[in-house]
């Protein structure tokens, strides 16, 4: 298995698809990386030479991926929460922050339904 940016890339997949195993690399960025390095994107990962893998490692190293990207995303959300802006408050409350309705939907963000509390008579 090839190892790029601390991630094992599956051998049986095409280079373009295999690179998407790296957090922060999608299909379009994977294709751009392949074009920049001259590595054919439809070539299987197991057929790549060591020189090809080294080129890919160098090119992926220029992009913010994996732990750095996760840390950056977390810091951005924390900054919003510290500012006390609308989006930060919604993050803090665990609600959607892009204007979706929450009266009936938003179950993914709000979590499972809670049982209603019965009043004593």
From Swiss-Prot:
The keyword RNA-binding applies. Keywords: Ribonucleoprotein, Ribosomal protein, RNA-binding, rRNA-binding, tRNA-binding. It comes from Cupriavidus necator (strain ATCC 17699 / DSM 428 / KCTC 22496 / NCIMB 10442 / H16 / Stanier 337). The gene is rpsM. Part of the 30S ribosomal subunit. Forms a loose heterodimer with protein S19. Forms two bridges to the 50S subunit in the 70S ribosome. Residues 91-121 are annotated as: Disordered. PROSITE patterns: RIBOSOMAL_S13_1 (PS00646), RIBOSOMAL_S13_2 (PS50159). Located at the top of the head of the 30S subunit, it contacts several helices of the 16S rRNA. In the 70S ribosome it contacts the 23S rRNA (bridge B1a) and protein L5 of the 50S subunit (bridge B1b), connecting the 2 subunits; these bridges are implicated in subunit movement. Contacts the tRNAs in the A and P-sites. The keyword Iron-sulfur does not apply. It comes from the Bacteria. GO terms for cellular component: cytosol; small ribosomal subunit. GO terms for biological process: translation. Belongs to the universal ribosomal protein uS13 family. GO terms for molecular function: rRNA binding; structural constituent of ribosome; tRNA binding. This is Small ribosomal subunit protein uS13.
